[in-house]
Amino acid sequence: MKQLWLDIGNTRLKYWITQNETVIEHAAELHLQSPSDLLLGLIQHFNHQNIQKVGVSSVLDQHNNDRIRSILKRLHIPMIMAKVHQEYAALRCGYDHPEQLGIDRWLQVLAVAQPDRNVCVIGCGTALTIDLVKGYQHLGGYILPNLYLQRDALIQNTKGIKIPDSAFDDLEPGHNTIDAVHHGILLGLVSTIQTIMQQSPQQLVLTGGDAPLFAKFLQPYHPQIEPDLLLKGLQHYVRHQLP
């Protein structure tokens, strides 16, 4: 069976086509605040793939999600749009109001939750998201601006100092303003993760574009990089869909 999986984030649209659980096609594109237009341009391609089911993860608002549903109806196949539940597939949400938890974070936790397993899941995307899960209990988490959002905020609010792009590649004290900014921002996020990991023994799972960068500085915790963690969570969600 061929299935289409969509991950519609704040800035990118990613899709996977799988056949018998094997990924046979994968792509990711910036949607420039118009994900429905980007999806519309892909529909003809999807129509020729003999896809039999589509699973969707979308962080968009209700209006945009309605447009996404409308476009996907052109495929004339069953569609499942994932949402956060108080409890689903044995996993219990740690938020007081589950609807406030991002679907991307929920699916990432769903992908790693197992009995007798404590996991810290770090999403290294537009924001740095941190979620803790013990067995099948989601314990809540943290959201921080990512490396680039912090740098941009500093540039916008610091008069007289120009901070050009540079690499986030070192935790040593900077010997010029550019390095001091980049090393300082990276140190702040790495230190946050280290503090959380020191509070209780747990497995560290990293996902998202900057996962390899953070893994480089978190080697004592033996980080596991999972590029397609959301896909695994979405597949798990669809397998255990509610009637």
Swiss-Prot record:
In this protein, the active site sits at: 104
Q: How does it assemble?
A: Homodimer.
What CDD domains would the database entry show?
A: ASKHA_NBD_PanK-III (cd24015)
The coenzyme or cofactor needed here is: NH4(+); K(+)
- GO BP of this protein: coenzyme A biosynthetic process
Instruction: Give the catalysed reaction(s), semicolon-separated.
Output: (R)-pantothenate + ATP = (R)-4'-phosphopantothenate + ADP + H(+)
- E.C. number(s) listed in UniProt: 2.7.1.33
Pathway field: Cofactor biosynthesis; coenzyme A biosynthesis; CoA from (R)-pantothenate: step 1/5
- Which HAMAP family does the protein's record reference? Pantothen_kinase_3
Q: Report what the protein is called.
A: Type III pantothenate kinase
Q: Which family does it belong to?
A: Belongs to the type III pantothenate kinase family.
Q: What does this protein do?
A: Catalyzes the phosphorylation of pantothenate (Pan), the first step in CoA biosynthesis.
Lineage here is: Bacteria, Pseudomonadati, Pseudomonadota, Gammaproteobacteria, Moraxellales
Major localization listed first in the record, in broad terms: cytoplasm
**UniProt: ATP binding residues:** 7-14, 126
- Give the CC-aspect GO terms: cytoplasm
Q: What class of enzyme is it?
A: transferase
* Record has Membrane as a keyword: no
Kindly give the InterPro entries that the UniProt entry links to this protein: ATPase_NBD (IPR043129), Type_III_PanK (IPR004619)
Annotated Pfam families: Pan_kinase
Q: How is the cofactor bound?
A: A monovalent cation. Ammonium or potassium.
Task: Give the location in the cell.
Answer: Cytoplasm
Q: Give the keywords, sorted.
A: ATP-binding, Coenzyme A biosynthesis, Cytoplasm, Kinase, Nucleotide-binding, Potassium, Transferase
Binding-site list for substrate: 95, 102-105, 177
Any one GO MF term held by the record is: ATP binding
